[in-house]
Amino acid sequence: MLDNEKITLAHGAGGRVMQELISKRILSQFSSDILEKFNIEVSLADLDDSAVVNDIVFTTDSHTVKPLFFPGGDIGSLSVAGTINDIAVMGVEPLGLSCAFVLEEGFPISELDRIITSMGTSSKTAGVPILTGDTKVVERGSVEKMFINTSGIGKRTEQLDKNIEIVKKYRKFEGRWLKDSNLNPGDKIILTGSVGDHGIALLSYREGYGFETELQSDVWPLNKMLQATISVGGIVAMKDPTRGGLANTLNEWSEKSGVGIKIDEQLIPVKPAVHAACEMLGMDPLTIGNEGKAVIGVVPELAEDVLKAVKGFTEGAEAAIIGEVKAQKEQKGVVMETLMGGRRIVDAPAGDPVPRIC
Ligand code: MG
């Protein structure tokens, strides 16, 4: 990079440009020999949903969604559910959150009240307390209205240990955590519900396209559903397909696990309004961000049992087994069998097709 280069929106979009910023500029400065004093089983360099240090699961996320209120949620519910989900997909129980507000001078107290009420409701729904926080106010014009950062911690459970024991009955499994790099050929891929609801509901509302009348964000804390699935056993990896959508999640899994992934378009739930909006806007629902969905990698022998557990929850009612993992010699990257009977490569989006949704 040249000295006069500046940050662009793409640097925060979750795609390749952001990955480059992290790997070239950030990781090199944050890795040092002090790390050796700690038992770090999932590190910053893993770029997973959370890190794990001395058996504590830890994650953080800043929320800059625009507008602050949208169909189905607001920045408050999003900031609570988003961080809980990043902990929950590690297969552990979230213990608590921090919450830090950056507010612009002049922000209406009535709106702040609505947002805080919404955070409280999400926290109660999930059964995860907000334990510590911070509030800063900056001069008018120096931020846009409000940003919220939430961090969260989680702890390992007996169920996670049992889940991994069960995996080991069926195949080799290394390590003690559900990581993006854990997939093996033969594993099945479960998606817990329809894709694109959050991104399209928000975009449509923001731009006035009209689809928001029949569509809401899926923002929801998934910890209870995911804990129930872990109790079934056989799960090797989980991820919430947020920025970059399902396409990004599956490509991360494929790259980090060194496997191919085959999915079937016919099996992927897409709501009619999302389908219609994507047709109109020339977008791919697989690349649109979700805030209340998880992708689960599971040994084939237990895929139906895990699916059944997911479907027992309202938030997982539309879940489906959408594909399976292939050996790289058989298939590289992520490939989808299309409704037309063809095959297409599913790439990770380079940037964010819908900016400012989380
Ligand atoms: Mg995540």
Give the label of every model feature segment.
Residues 10, 14-22, 104-106, 213-290:
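Active-site-proximal betaalpha loop/short-helix elements
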Residues 196-204:
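Short, Lys/Arg- and Gly-enriched loop/turn segments at beta-strand edges
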Residues 298-304:
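Helix N-cap motif at beta-to-alpha junctions
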Residues 313-358:
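Acidic, Ser/Thr/Pro-rich beta/coil linker or hinge segments at domain junctions
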